[in-house]
Amino acid sequence: NDALVGSFDIPLVENEGDTLKIVFNSEKTIGFIEKAQVLFYENNYAIKQEYVDLANKLMDNTALMTIFRLSLTDSLRDMEADYMILPCPKYDEAQQNYCGFTHNGFSVFCIPVTCATPDIAAATLEALCAESYRTCTLAYYETTIKGKLARDTDTAEMLDLIHEGVRFDFGYVYSASLADLIQIPRNYINNGKTSKGASTLAKKVELSEKKLPVLLEAFENLQ
């Protein structure tokens, strides 16, 4: 469900002057929740299970498709049936491009306060990350994913399409500090078809709005 927020081009946080504003309480978010509830609870072709179980069903040929992170391709290497990788769907025909958020599970470095030369340590880490982006990431994407795991040229083309639409949303990246903002639609959908997205979305977002100034102040104190 979280992936569809990105593919449907639903912003969580946007710039407003010299600050940020949560814009997740929108008609589009409500529309997404309502459509997802229809998909999961008014038809018999959607399976609501844990990610790992859905991946196993795909590999066992008991599911036609699943939404998953690109890391799943490592597990699909030994899958007997052919498979394709496709971008997540658009919200509607009016949406111009395929897009998606990066996941909010990032690796980070921490420099201890006992470090005698924090500026040098930070510069070194930044240089290593930059070089990794230029070499390791490229090798993984072009050589491993496209060259070894993709089973046809169409999949390689789809990967480029997905890569071109990747973007960051502050509200997703820092969701854990914003009362789990990205998880609001997921929780509604998991609660069943009786869940009313429009009636309680504002209350949930209001809690995130209270957390945002605290997070921004923490960033300002780093300067």
Q: What kind of region is each of these model predictions?
A:
Residues 33, 37, 55, 121-125, ...:
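Extracytoplasmic/secreted envelope proteins and their assembly/folding machinery
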Residues 113-122, 130-223:
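Conserved C-terminal helix/tail region of periplasmic/extracytoplasmic solute-binding proteins
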Residues 64-69, 84:
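Paired acidic/hydrophobic, glycine-rich loop segments that form the ligand-binding mouth/hinge
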Residues 77-143, 147:
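Extracytoplasmic/periplasmic substrate-recognition and gating elements
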Residues 28-31, 77-81, 88, 100-102, ...:
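Extended alpha-helical or coil "stalk/linker/tether" regions that are enriched in polar/charged
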Residues 35-43, 61, 127-135:
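Structured segments of extracytoplasmic/periplasmic soluble domains
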Residues 51-66, 74:
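Short helices/loops that flank or line small-molecule/ion binding pockets
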Residues 2-6, 10-50:
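Glycine-centered hinge/linker elements that transmit conformational signals in sensory
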